[in-house]
Structures are given as structure tokens and as C-alpha cells.
From Swiss-Prot:
HAMAP family: YajQ. CDD domains: YajQ_like (cd11740). This is Nucleotide-binding protein YE3147. InterPro entries: DUF520, UPF0234-like_C, UPF0234_N, YajQ-like_sf. It comes from Yersinia enterocolitica serotype O:8 / biotype 1B (strain NCTC 13174 / 8081). One of its GO terms (cellular component) is cytosol. Nucleotide-binding protein. Belongs to the YajQ family. PANTHER family: UPF0234 PROTEIN YAJQ. Keywords: Nucleotide-binding. GO terms for molecular function: nucleotide binding. NCBIfam families: PRK05412.1. Transmembrane segments: none annotated.
Length: 163
């Protein structure tokens, strides 16, 4: 029976490249001349710290970062940005976490979405991924289109497609 896995993975090398490109962009921007602003990638915590001297500049830095991530093939929804900014002295900062893996609550939403679609497929939660099996390849492709179209707040990839 044909099957595929739904996963949520981020290539950390691409994230590193995007942060380096964003830092390069920052050096070339005239509105950030002589302004202490930075991007810091923490691969251990899978987060990116963005810091500057005003909250407006932090928002601009986040826009630069999102643009660079998109250029490198990583969706902007992969960043989990907190509502409130940290402030210490003259510096505002935000620690944006990278979403990887499918949490159990999100996996249950995926399975419910698939079952509510009334397609002839089965969905099973397997750790941090969801396996979808069905008799017809067309049904599996319909599930892929359904998930791409649904706004679940996290980017998903499909791998391990088997006939």
C-alpha cells in the first residue's frame, strides 16, 4: 500500500546561511549604520536572537531575517516569535525559536483534519511524524494538497513516499 510521512524539519545549515546573509544585509543597510544591531544563531537551543536599540529596529531585523529564510527555502512560519520583547538597558531583543518536529497536539490536529476529509486513507502518529497510508496514490496526493492548504501554524514536509 502506498504511504508517506508528514514531518516538520529544518535544515540547520540553511538557517546558518540565512543568518549570515541577514548579517551581511544589515551591514549594507544605511538605516542601521552606527547602530548596535545583531543576529545570533544558537544551534543548541535552535533559536535566533535578534537585538537592536529600539523595538521598531528589531521588527525591521525580523523582516530581514524572514526574507533571508524564505530565500533559503525555509518558511517564515518555522519561526516562533514571542509577542513581548526583552529589554535590558538600551537594548531590545527577541529570541525566535525554530519549530522542528510535530508535537502531539499538532499531530492530533493533522490526523483529525485527514479523517474529517473523508478520504480513504489512514493516518497514524509515530513519534514526531505522521504516517499516512492509502490504497490509491491519488488519495495520498489529495491529503498532501489538503495539508498544504491548511493553516496549521507550522510548515510541513512530505518524505518517505512509497508505492
Amino acid at each position: 500500500m502506498p504511504s508517506f510521512d508528514i514531518v516538520s524539519e529544518i535544515d540547520m545549515q540553511e538557517v546558518r546561511n540565512a543568518v549570515e546573509n541577514a548579517t551581511r544585509d544589515l551591514a549594507n543597510r544605511w538605516d542601521f549604520r552606527n547602530v548596535p544591531a545583531s543576529f545570533e544563531l544558537n544551534e543548541k537551543n535552535e533559536s535566533i536572537k535578534v537585538a537592536s536599540e529600539s523595538d521598531f529596529q528589531v521588527e525591521q531585523l525580523l523582516d530581514i531575517l524572514r526574507a533571508q529564510l524564505t530565500k533559503r527555502g525555509i518558511e517564515g512560519a518555522a519561526l516562533e516569535i514571542p509577542e513581548e520583547m526583552d529589554r535590558s538597558g538600551k537594548t531590545y531583543s527577541v529570541e525566535a525559536k525554530l519549530k522542528q518536529g510535530i508535537e502531539s497536539v499538532q499531530a492530533k490536529k493533522l490526523v483529525k483534519l485527514i479523517k474529517d476529509s473523508k478520504l480513504k486513507v489512514q493516518a497514524q502518529i509515530q513519534g514526531e511524524q505522521v504516517r499516512v497510508t492509502g490504497k490509491a496514490r491519488d488519495d495520498l496526493q489529495s491529503v498532501m494538497a489538503l495539508i498544504r492548504g491548511a493553516d496549521l501554524g507550522q510548515p510541513f514536509q512530505f518524505n518517505n513516499f512509497r508505492d
